[in-house]
């Protein structure tokens, strides 16, 4: 009798534990994915802010540079969308229109949203004593309203003027390479292929940030396409 009772208790306990370890109740109809597979699906060198910090431990302060649009600013897209609608609806000719650059660089970025990952990165670098620079592929406007906005937004301790590389003459293949070299940058952060390739051309460490899926800057680049490090959770 005692043995029967013991078996009954064990059976009840086992049944109670089943829901906690239960599998899917219905077979999936689509391939789908999960959080781990999303990170493991492709051979990408993912890296975190903490890992970057660890890689710099014991090293003297360095110079680091950031692209602006889609890298430190989550949503500068409205400025470009407005510019396209105003100066060349349905076309990209507005990017060659100096009136557009005068307008967007004069202060449109005050409507942009900073990326949290950029705030975390910049805070980490400034805590180390690193110097922060901003390089952009934009063409310079008559007034630089970008520098003071970035200085305030990211609480930059020793702000350097933004380098507008879009219209500068160069002997390099990529437009940010001269700035990376002249400012002795050790790490360059950016979302575009040109950012990654400019870092490679300059011979420095390039780390890619993810571009937000709803950015107007299309097509989307391939993360890890050049074997570069990619900052995890960096689309926002």
Swiss-Prot record:
The active site is at residues 67, 69. It is an enzyme of class 3 (hydrolase). Substrate binds at residues 136-137, 176. Mg(2+) binds at residues 67, 69, 191. Homotetramer. Dephosphorylates several organic phosphate monoesters. Also has a phosphotransferase activity catalyzing the transfer of low-energy phosphate groups from organic phosphate monoesters to free hydroxyl groups of various organic compounds. This is Class B acid phosphatase.
């Amino acid at each position: 009798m005692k043995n029967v009772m013991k078996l009954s208790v064990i059976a009840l306990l086992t049944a109670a534990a089943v829901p906690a370890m239960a599998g899917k109740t219905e077979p999936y109809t689509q391939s789908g994915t999960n959080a781990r597979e999303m990170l493991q699906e492709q051979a990408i060198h993912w890296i975190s802010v903490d890992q970057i910090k660890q890689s710099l431990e014991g090293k003297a302060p360095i110079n680091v540079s950031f692209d602006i649009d889609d890298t430190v600013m989550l949503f500068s897209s409205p400025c470009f969308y407005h510019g396209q609608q105003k100066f060349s609806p349905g076309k990209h000719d507005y990017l060659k229109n100096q009136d557009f650059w005068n307008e967007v660089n004069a202060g449109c970025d005050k409507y942009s949203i900073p990326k949290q990952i950029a705030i975390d990165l910049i805070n980490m670098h400034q805590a180390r004593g690193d110097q922060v620079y901003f390089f952009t592929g934009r063409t310079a406007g008559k007034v630089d309203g970008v520098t003071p906005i970035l200085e305030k937004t990211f609480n930059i301790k020793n702000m350097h003027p933004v380098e507008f590389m879009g219209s500068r003459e160069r002997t390099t293949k990529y437009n940010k390479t001269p700035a990376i070299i002249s400012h002795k940058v050790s790490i360059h952060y950016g979302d575009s292929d040109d950012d990654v390739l400019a870092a490679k051309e300059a011979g420095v460490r390039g780390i890619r940030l993810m571009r937000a899926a709803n950015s107007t800057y299309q097509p989307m680049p391939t993360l890890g396409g050049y074997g570069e490090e990619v900052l995890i959770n960096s689309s926002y």
